[in-house]
Structures are given as structure tokens and as C-alpha cells.
């Protein structure tokens, strides 16, 4: 780890941790229905939306009604996004004349964006019309993030309330998170990105003549538009030579802003934030990294204020920051190591360079390694370089951060409710060690609570490992692997980890836009999202019904360094050890290969 990366990391954390309390306080006020600086324009619109939908925001829901409302809303979202993709060839705002998306790809994409995963098996500039990008994908970027915030706030209410039967109103939480948090921040960030050169228009694509002929390989497609494979299962490609380049246009900045702030991650273009029209320079890169973790960090402060003790939120934030700093340093160190070719040339370890494969020259190793850590610490999935080109151990950092459950800051809302599940596990373990009934924030942790916590922690590993096994055993699964051996296994493991944990980034060597992977990854995304959410809401309902107990002398404090250390240990030991055998077969084996 060199001085460039250390300076960038310290600057990043300083800005992030200074902004978190300010935004966290605003989120608490907005979600509680208190007056904020946005009330003057937001409240009339909020009331109008309630009247239009026939919703009484004061009518509270128990956890079951809250869960049903959330699930119905998200199922309707899948149907709407699917329909828009299938019909886009007949709809307006399609200057490139793009046809409707294939059924399996459309279903995968619909589930992906509704679940806040934003896994993309397609290239946006050659698949999605402007209308689909705006009305289907961008809208889901907002409401999927708002759903995560709403579920978190319901859990926090469960911890803050006592002897209560309700958790709030899902529709009110959804509207407030969108109107008062996501929309204003996205508007500000979109303007900032436009000022740096990010594209924002509805113009048709521009055809440019290149000075030199370009030659590249493209996947050979069948009559249904699916990639073809040879007798041995290898992908078939065609060589294309051209002197014409299409420069894609579109409403990029408006989608880019919420893609980052909502920890969605789906790029307008295939190259995502490595594309100069999405992320032109170092300033836009810093803004995008800050946007990814801004709301997850701020929600820790919101949590502390809502439960009546800011130190509770600070302790959770401290644990997240310790884990994040460690993983960031690891990624930077391994990516700064010279590749085998550079090592043979006796390149210095601390010299500029390192593993530059798959990295944009305008960002370099340090900014790419930090971006990779940021985007997989959150359930974002946006990338400014190719994770598949990371070194074997450098690629472990983004992979393992996802496998921990996306709790190191994590997604908007989802990261903190996942970390709170680990916090309850930590106090449960501590209670067992000292022979006392475990308590968290004055609530006794009982059998039902631990069953829900266990479901939250173990659901995604089960999906990841089972899905990886199915893909490795199936002919259709192995056919999508471009690189054989340990790295090919890592590509499958990464795809399943990304889908089940709702991240969306990929080791791009896997040809995943096939019926097999579209269905398999779609199932992983759906159950990885909603199994955990329903378990969290059941946990919230159980905690809300409990009386609050006074602090006892022998109780474990949950605001000090000891608790932070115990929480970090619980995340690493319980989360990471689950995947040790799989990691040994993939990136570790690849690293040990001569």
C-alpha cells in the first residue's frame, strides 16, 4: 500500500464520516414525519400522493401487513419492468430502434432492478431504449432503495418501541424515503456529475469515423439472440473490422446519481463507471465513491438518534469502518503487487504501476482498488475497472465483502439491518460466555429472535453455495465459463455471491446472458432479498412487542471498544468461515498455481 492510496483512503473516510451525522439527522426527521428544510415543497406533494393512492399514513401496520405491502409492491414492480422491456420496440424514446428484450433476459433484469441488485447480463447502450432506462430502471433504482430504507426504519422502530404491536406504515416510509432523501440528493449529484462531463440528453447516437480501422471479437448469436457455443462448450465468436464508431448518448447523469446513492449499481453503459460518459475524471470518481456509502453511513447515525443513544450508532459505524479500512488496504496491496511479467522485469513494488490490467489509466491502481472495495462493501455493484482482471488475491477482497452479507456499510438500509442482525448475534454469544440472558437495547433476545437472526445470516450462504454447485454440475453452467480451472470456478462463485447478496458486480469472463444463468441468478436475487427482509420484519415485530428492561450491572455495554471488537469478530468468523472451502477451490488455488 503506497502513499497515494493511503492519502486517498484518509481523504475519503474524512469526508464520508463528517457528512454522515448531518445527513443521518435529516433522515431521522424525514422518516419520523418531522419538519425538515424540504417540508415546504415536499409536504404538499407527499399529501397528494397519499390521496391519489388512498393511503392513510397514520394507519400503522404490524410486521405481517408491512411485509405483505412490501412484497405486493415489489411484485408489481417486476411485472412493470418486464412489460416495458418486452414492449420497448413499439414504445417512444427509442432513437436507436432497439427491439424488445428476450423473455429470460427481461425477467432477470426486472428481478435484478427491483431487488436493488442491478445485475446486468446485457449491454445497456445496445439493449435498452431511453424510455426503458428512465421509466423502468431509474424508477426502480429509487423505489428499491426506498424499500431498503423503509425496512431498516421498521427494524429500528422495533428496537426503539416497547410493548408495541406495530412498526409504522410501509407506504408512508416508502414515500418519505423517496421524496425527502433520495430525490433531493440525486438532483444535487446529477448536476455535479453534469458539470464534470457526464452525458445528459435524449439525442440519437452519434456516428463517428475513426482514423484507424478497429478489429474486435464479438459473441456469435443464434436466431433468438443468445450466445452460441461450440462442441466442447466454448463460446463462439466472430471477428469484426470497422472504421465507424457509434457514440452512445442518453439521460445518463440522472440515472447515474441514483444508481450510486441508492447502492443500485446498474450502469447506463456496458462499461459502467469505467465509461468516460459515466465517470469522466478523478473528481467525478471521488463523488461517485462518496455517493455510494453516504446514505449507508448516515443511517448508522439515524439509528442512534431513533433509539435514543447516538453512541449505539457510532459503535456500529466504527465496526463497519474498521472492516472497510482493512479490506481497502488488502485490495490496494495485492493490486499494487507487480504481475508475473512485471516481476520478471524486476519492477519495484512501490513504483507506479502494479496490476494495471483492466484498469482505466485516468484512475490507476489506487482509485480502482478503492472503488472496488467501496462498491462491494455496499451492495452497489458499480465498477470503474474490471474485477475479473484483478489478481487472484486482489479479487478476494470484493468477493469476500459480498459473502460477508453486504454488512460493511452495506446497501441503503439493507447493510445496517444486516449488521444489526450480527450485533444481536454478538450479544447472544457474549451472553452465553458469561452465563446471562442476552439483551440488546433493553430487549431480551429469545429463541424466535435468534431463529430470525440465523435465517438472515445463513440464507445467502446457502443460496450462494447451492447455486454454485448447480452451475458447476450442469452442462449449461459450465458452458458459460470462459476461463477454465480455478479462475472459472471463481467466476461462477462471484456471480452467485453477487446475485444472492444483491450486489450486481461481476467477474465479466462468465457468459451469463443465457436462459440457465438468467433463471438461476434471478432466483438467487429474489430469495436473497426477500427471505432476509421478511425475517428482519418478523424480528422487528418480536422486538417491538417486548418490554424494555432497565440496564443491569452485569449486562454487556454495546457502545464501547469491546463490543466493536466482538462485532467485527462475529462478522469475520461467522460470515467468512462459511466460504473458506469455496475460496480455497477458487482464488486461493489460482494464486498457488505456478
UniProtKB/Swiss-Prot annotation:
It is found in: Cell inner membrane. Pfam families: KdpA. It comes from the Bacteria. Keywords: Cell inner membrane, Cell membrane, Ion transport, Membrane, Potassium, Potassium transport, Transmembrane, Transmembrane helix, Transport. It is a multi-pass membrane protein. PANTHER family: POTASSIUM-TRANSPORTING ATPASE A CHAIN (PTHR30607), POTASSIUM-TRANSPORTING ATPASE POTASSIUM-BINDING SUBUNIT (PTHR30607:SF2). The system is composed of three essential subunits: KdpA, KdpB and KdpC. This is Potassium-transporting ATPase potassium-binding subunit. It comes from Bordetella bronchiseptica (strain ATCC BAA-588 / NCTC 13252 / RB50).
